[in-house]
Amino acid sequence: VTEAEFQQQIIDTARLLGWRCYHTFDSRRSEAGFPDLVLVRDRVVHLEVKSETGRLSPEQADWIAAINAAGGTALVVRPSMWEEIVASLKRR
């Protein structure tokens, strides 16, 4: 599964579970490293979507750390985490 396919799978599932989903389509024009997805329902979750072998850039790691340090939730997700991702999206 490609990163783009995995990302779409997350978006489709999240929407079915009542989440609002935001993705910047042309990230070249936005702040470097900002997470791929912002999901909003009863909480806000930022997701950086990676393939199994994909690596975080320093800017991505900085954004994730900053969001979490500010009390937010930012995670790196990979296809092998699918069951955990779905369980988290179902949780209220």
For the regions a language model picked out, list residue spans one by one:
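Catalytic phosphate/metal-binding cores of nucleic-acid and nucleotide-processing enzymes, i.e., regions
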Residues: 1-92
